[in-house]
């Protein structure tokens, strides 16, 4: 598997992880005011997932542009 293929696969996995985190945050918001103490932890997890996804997308774009 080439580096480019590995990056694409990594982006797909991170997209799935970010979508799951987004759904969890949305579900938590629908349950408010119950579970309000979990907001920070779930939001941080969601933020981290999207930050990792953004970094991977930038890396992939740079790799594709360097070809």
Swiss-Prot record:
Transmembrane domains' residue ranges: none
GO biological process, one term: nitrogen fixation
Family classification: Belongs to the UPF0437 family.
Name by which UniProt lists this protein: UPF0437 protein y4xE
This protein's UniProt keywords: Nitrogen fixation, Plasmid
Organismal lineage: Bacteria, Pseudomonadati, Pseudomonadota, Alphaproteobacteria, Hyphomicrobiales
Species this chain originates from: Sinorhizobium fredii (strain NBRC 101917 / NGR234)
């Amino acid at each position: 598997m080439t580096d480019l293929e590995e990056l694409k696969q990594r982006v797909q996995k991170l997209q799935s992880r970010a979508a799951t985190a987004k759904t969890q945050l949305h579900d938590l918001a629908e349950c408010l005011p119950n579970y309000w103490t979990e907001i920070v932890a779930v939001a941080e997890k969601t933020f981290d997932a999207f930050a990792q996804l953004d970094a991977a997308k930038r890396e992939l774009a740079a790799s594709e542009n360097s070809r």
